[in-house]
């Protein structure tokens, strides 16, 4: 999948504390320094823990945004803060926009300053490289030009663009009735969304394709077929008032003319669909999150599947897998669970990247997996949240929230962050708490029209 990045990353040996201070110097007499007890972790209540992890995750997009564009950096290394500091993640920036809306609503960041920043960000996107309306996967924050994601991936990326457009629509809906500056921001978001040529990315077929390059055309040849993280591209394509895709692209492309359905089960829980490459099992948990930051799966069904049940089952299966722990990794439990794409520990101890899932379990837990599943598994996700903040806060929480990944088995922690992993935490926890981002996205008139055109029904929203 597109998210399976070979980062060629170096080996991390030390966990860096963001709050460390120099030790006092000895007096030169050889007398041992006094021992200072480690600070005691004050346990947080459930509400306090949800507040804190949302505040912490917001920092990635507020304190560590790309300096020129104010959009989301692809990654942030606590030991190399300037590493690839100009690379903007298009999809991660969409998640970041929704994260900032949560921050405003909860009073964690100042509203007026956030509006100014988002206006800067959207004006940057307005002038950045676009390819038939779609943005590339990576953008240079200094110039707005495309940074190739791979040799032939130097053009439009319709999936990353869809993730961004979820954020644009949430911003539009949140600010459309605000003051003059806010209404201007909403109009800018609307213009950007309406400029995407979704139908171009069908290449005239009854399916959508991930990439198009002005140099290599359709050479990447990646057809979007379910089930994975790309459902939102089809929904937004059908919802577009300017460049809509045909309904047949959804039914034949995403749904594979019904072949998306699968009757297998794991741990007595129905898998429901064919997870790409998982042969009767489930894929990484980001598949249950990226398309659903804005699109509310509760009570949402099409001809083939109930997406509320599907996403909940996916999260429950991953939880049960970690509890069963068939590979006998030390540390897996009902409070330490969660498999998704993230940084990982390679066999030789270096840091790499992989899509963790039951069929690709390397003993690495990724915090965003359980945290961003709060709407589906609130009890199980709360156990993990309290484990993070009440038991492991000193080594697993850093300057922008939970570190990207850790392995209890190998006593390994990466002190790195990724936009696409931090960016789902605050919105999905907020969807669990108040449904804020779901309500904003689902109230967009064109989204409802698009969903209905594809045969979707929603008991939650009455259509």
Where are these regions (language model features)?
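Surface-exposed, charge/polar-rich loops and edge strands
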Residues: 10
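Ser/Thr/Asn(+Pro)-rich, low-complexity disordered segments
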Residues: 33-463
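Bacterial Sec-dependent N-terminal signal peptides
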Residues: 3-4, 13-43
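Generic structural signal for short, solvent-exposed loop/turn connectors between secondary structure elements
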Residues: 2-3, 205
């Amino acid at each position: 999948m597109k998210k399976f990045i070979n980062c060629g990353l170096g080996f991390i040996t030390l966990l860096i504390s963001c709050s460390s201070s120099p030790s006092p110097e000895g007096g030169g007499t050889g007398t041992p320094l006094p021992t200072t007890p480690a600070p005691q972790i004050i346990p947080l209540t459930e509400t306090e823990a949800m507040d804190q992890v949302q505040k912490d995750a917001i920092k990635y997009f507020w304190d560590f945004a790309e300096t020129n564009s104010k959009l989301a950096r692809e990654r942030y290394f606590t030991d190399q803060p300037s590493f690839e500091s100009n690379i903007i993640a298009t999809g991660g920036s969409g998640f970041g926009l929704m994260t900032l809306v949560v921050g405003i609503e909860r009073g964690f960041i100042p509203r007026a300053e956030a509006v100014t920043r988002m206006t800067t960000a959207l004006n940057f996107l307005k002038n950045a490289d676009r390819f038939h309306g779609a943005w590339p996967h990576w953008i240079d924050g200094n110039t707005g030009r495309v940074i190739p994601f791979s040799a032939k991936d130097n053009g439009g990326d319709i999936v990353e663009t869809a993730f961004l457009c979820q954020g644009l629509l949430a911003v539009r809906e949140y600010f459309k009735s605000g003051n003059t500056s806010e209404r201007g921001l909403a109009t800018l978001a609307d213009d950007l969304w309406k400029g995407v040529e979704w139908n171009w990315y069908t290449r005239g077929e009854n399916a959508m394709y991930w990439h198009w390059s002005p140099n290599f055309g359709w050479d990447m040849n990646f057809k979007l077929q379910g089930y994975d993280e790309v459902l939102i591209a089809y929904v937004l394509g059908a919802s577009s008032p300017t460049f809509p895709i045909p309904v047949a692209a959804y039914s034949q492309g995403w749904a594979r003319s019904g072949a998306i359905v699968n009757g297998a089960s794991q741990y007595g829980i129905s898998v429901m669909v064919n997870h790409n490459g998982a042969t009767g099992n489930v894929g990484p948990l980001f598949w249950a999150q990226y398309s659903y930051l804005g699109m509310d799966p509760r009570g949402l069904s099409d001809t083939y599947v109930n997406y509320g049940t599907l996403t909940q089952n996916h999260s429950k299966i991953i939880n049960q897998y970690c509890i069963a722990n068939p590979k006998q990794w030390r540390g897996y439990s009902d409070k330490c669970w969660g498999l998704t794409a993230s940084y990982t520990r390679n066999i030789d101890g270096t840091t790499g990247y992989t899509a963790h899932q039951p069929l690709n379990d390397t003993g690495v837990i990724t915090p965003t997996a359980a945290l961003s599943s709060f709407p589906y598994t609130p009890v199980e996700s709360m156990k993990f949240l309290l484990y993070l903040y009440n038991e492991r806060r000193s080594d697993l929480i850093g300057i922008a929230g939970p570190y990207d990944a850790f392995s209890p088995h190998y006593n390994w922690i990466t002190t790195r962050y990724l936009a696409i992993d931090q960016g789902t935490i605050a919105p999905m926890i907020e969807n669990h708490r108040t449904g804020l981002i779901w309500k904003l996205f689902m109230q967009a008139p064109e989204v409802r029209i698009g969903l209905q055109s594809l045969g979707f029904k929603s008991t939650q929203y009455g259509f």
